Amino acid sequence: MFLAKNLKNNKIKVCLPKKKFAALSTASIQTNERPNPDKVLKDIAKYVHETPLKSSLALDTARLCFLDTLGCGLAALKFKQAQNIIKPIVPGTIVPSGTKILGTSYVMDPVKGAFAIGTLIRWLDYNDCWLAAEWGHPSDNLGGILAVADHLSRLNKATHGKNGKQFLVKDVLEAMIKAHEIQGIIALENSFNKVGLDHVVLVKVATAGVVSKMLGLSQEQTIEALSQAFVDGQSLRTYRHAPNTGSRKSWAAGDAVSRAVNLAYLVKNANVGTIPSVLTARTWGFYDVLFKGKPFSFQQRSKYDSYVMENVLFKISFPAEFHAQTAVEAAVKAYRILAKQGKTFKDIKSIRIRTQEAAMRIIDKSGPLYNYADRDHCIQYMIAVPLITGNLTATDYSDEVARNPEIDNLRSKMYCIEDTHLTQNYHDPDKRSIGNALLIELNDGTQLDEIFVEYPVGHKFRREEGIPLLMNKFQRHLREHFVESPDKVDLIMKVSSKTNFLNMQIDKYMDLFTEG
């Protein structure tokens, strides 16, 4: 409808449109009724606060995971960049009753301490692994768990029990089991990588959940912290993939656990509030914004218990991205076979790598490799080095080693193909295999028998074989760090093996790992 004014007689003419207007929509009017918290938040919080842990296998595995993770953290200190990333922003800062950082003399607040510990234990990509629809390293959560447990224990002593809480090694292990479970169960069917998100979002969520209880928060406050973790800006996987692979992948988990600890403290100290439909809110929620409108699926396992810790994968033999572990093992076998025939890598014409879809997406890489992080996420590089030397170590990713032109020459002779059967077994919850096979053709036209390795030493199916090797790995990392203190190495090994180890105060145990 519009109006036209007759200027002569000052009359107003009403003009109606020929077509009727459509009924006005009120769909844009948003209701402000506060919903109940999303079920995912409630389920996690209930698990953290109410579910008792009864699995002796999970507890035994958690002890191995704990020791292995600490050893990996010490080993990271051999690298200058790792040292520089974790040091205090203000030099010389010592926080009263703060978190002690393993392998150093640093004493930090629990937020910065979580970043430092989380960064060290992830730096070498040598700690445990969980492979499902989403990949990840659940022991990353120890960065936040240990930082909070150590600080609260020291605070408890300093205030004669008035503040803080005394944590035992067993408390830390149980927190690890629950953090592993939260991260791993969500990862079973929900692929964050396929929407471009990094798996450390799950580290942030899992750490926020278990740390909330450690801080004495209620179940409702834990929901509050979890909602804040989900709404927090999530990391992109850009830094894990060509052509942008870089060192951030080595400190992303440290960043995630520090943010989780900070959020839990914000809930504790400032009651920052719950975002109840953080996942399900239309338009603005996590699902619509970041997950293409798809809610999380929990068809394989709908309950949280201790499944993930019981089935976690250990990296024992090589500091290699887990999808390449069996490929590296196959390469070492190939090196020995060639040696028996009086041949070397120089006799190789081509190498076919039969692998799983996940490896194709993550570590199949050609062209120049620019840094350590680039190399330890290239399956061709991780195969080439042991074919040349017979082994693969953390230093083999260094610039010095990478200058060897034979490595890139050998890389150029390799190609990957996906075996859908291997991909199927990779996702099979009863197998969880990570198979790789190498078919090597020599310059004289002969072929070696294909070398196939389906399960790495750290897999549950090879756990008994792996346990003594895992303890040797832990002891090796101790010896390499405490070179001038062999007695300290012996003491740590002795204490860590005692039957009453679980009842040791966590701060007393961590004192054994610090300097000064």
Swiss-Prot record:
Single GO cellular component term: mitochondrion
Keyword Lyase found: yes
Biological processes, Gene Ontology terms: propionate metabolic process; propionate metabolic process, methylcitrate cycle
Coiled coil: none
Catalytic activity from the UniProt record: (2S,3S)-2-methylcitrate = 2-methyl-cis-aconitate + H2O
InterPro entries in alphabetical order: 2Me_IsoCit_deHydtase_PrpD (IPR012705), MmgE/PrpD_sf (IPR036148), MmgE/PrpD_sf_1 (IPR042183), MmgE/PrpD_sf_2 (IPR042188), MmgE_PrpD (IPR005656), MmgE_PrpD_C (IPR045337), MmgE_PrpD_N (IPR045336)
Highest rank taxon of the organism: Eukaryota
Recorded GO MF terms: 2 iron, 2 sulfur cluster binding; 2-methylcitrate dehydratase activity
Family, as annotated: Belongs to the PrpD family.
Other facts: Present with 2730 molecules/cell in log phase SD medium.
Identification of the protein by name: Probable 2-methylcitrate dehydratase
Organism: Saccharomyces cerevisiae (strain ATCC 204508 / S288c) (Baker's yeast)
Lineage of the organism: Eukaryota, Fungi, Dikarya, Ascomycota, Saccharomycotina
Gene for this chain: PDH1
